[in-house]
């Protein structure tokens, strides 16, 4: 099998799996006062410190959650609610965000009367220059796009914010580009385990100590009174191991994946000359190659490749199965037909040249069959 969908989820690292299994054999609620509880708490706090050190944050700024979607919702709704009480009622969000961000922002507009400004992007997917109105409660712009891989100018956005809290979804960025929470200047940053070799179902929100945030979940207040719920200790420990690993290996993997990605792009262009590469040609993740294939339905092409044991995607797995054009490509100026004719190939720590060979061997026949089937309009 050629697995080319690492942006949806990447295989768990051996060292993360080993420590998960080891920790899962232990007993203890990290909120309990007895010995097993204190042992569990120690593992949680050590993991918090390790993640903080790897990502340029203070341990107290690491709030464990159930994953990227929860972290995005906590940051967007929580900061908005806290700031609305101070008279700020507007949210600025890029038009190419993951649906965990877009839908949370739209929910605030629909249910909380938030004023929303969707920030336009250029043809590569980079946010165009903007100014934040005085009533802005929050700005949210992802660090790296999950579909086309375009990197956003986060330092410039923070400078433009002029004191307005900035949230960034860095789920796709950690381990692929240098990420430093303090140096970036953002107020809140979303990360998750399963996109970097950790378990599914665990993530974190890095939240500045001076950033007000109203809780989404109420209960024990385990995480700085901002997030409640019994902590998943084995997943948290494995998550920390994975974060440390990908940050430590980032430069090596950058070089390796860049070479693989460039080879993939070159060879796809050779066998499908009219394929169109989407996203920024330079400021892009080494893991991502996103193409439009004129005359093809993306879903049909995906299934034809899947029949040959090649796993790819048409975009976010969180929106898979929904027959609609990519909102990312539409925001970049593509027409709906083109936006439905695209595939995302994403690489990760298990990717090899054999995966690219398998894709290139299967792609021409799949494209020919998909074109015979045509594109719905």
Model-found features: residue ranges?
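Pyridoxal 5′-phosphate
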Residues: 1-377
């Amino acid at each position: 099998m050629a697995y080319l969908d690492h942006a949806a989820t990447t295989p768990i690292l051996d060292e993360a799996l080993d420590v998960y299994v080891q920790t899962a054999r232990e007993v203890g609620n990290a909120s309990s006062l007895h010995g097993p509880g204190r042992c569990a708490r120690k593992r949680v706090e050590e993991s918090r410190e390790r993640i903080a050190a790897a990502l340029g944050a203070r341990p107290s700024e690491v709030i464990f959650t159930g994953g990227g979607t929860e972290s995005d919702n906590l940051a967007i709704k929580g900061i908005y609610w806290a700031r609305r009480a101070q008279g700020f009622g507007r949210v600025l969000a890029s038009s190419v965000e993951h649906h965990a961000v877009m839908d949370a922002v739209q929910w605030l507009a629909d249910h909380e009367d938030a004023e929303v400004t969707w920030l336009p992007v250029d043809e590569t997917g980079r946010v165009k220059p903007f100014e934040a109105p005085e009533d802005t409660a929050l700005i949210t712009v992802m660090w790296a796009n999950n579909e086309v891989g375009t990197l956003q100018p986060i330092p410039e956005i923070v400078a433009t914010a002029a004191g307005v809290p900035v949230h960034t979804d860095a789920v796709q960025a950690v381990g692929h580009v240098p990420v430093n929470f303090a140096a970036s200047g953002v107020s809140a940053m979303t990360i998750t385990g399963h996109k970097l070799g950790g378990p599914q179902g665990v993530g974190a929100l890095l939240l500045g100590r001076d950033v007000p945030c109203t809780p989404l979940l109420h209960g024990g207040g385990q995480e700085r009174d901002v997030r409640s719920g019994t902590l998943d200790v084995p997943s948290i420990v494995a998550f920390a191991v994975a974060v440390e690993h990908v940050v430590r290996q980032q430069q090596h993997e950058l070089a390796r994946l860049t070479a693989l990605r460039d080879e993939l792009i070159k060879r796809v262009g050779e066998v499908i000359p009219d394929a169109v590469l989407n996203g920024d040609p330079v400021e892009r993740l080494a893991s991502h190659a996103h193409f439009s294939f004129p005359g093809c339905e993306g879903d049909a092409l995906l299934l034809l490749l899947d029949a040959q044991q090649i796993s790819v995607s048409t975009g976010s797995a969180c929106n898979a199965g929904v027959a609609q054009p990519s909102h990312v490509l539409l925001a970049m100026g593509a027409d709906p037909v083109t936006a439905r004719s695209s595939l995302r190939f994403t690489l990760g720590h298990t990717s090899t040249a054999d995966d690219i060979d398998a894709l290139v061997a299967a792609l021409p026949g799949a494209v020919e069959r998909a074109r015979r089937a045509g594109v719905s309009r």
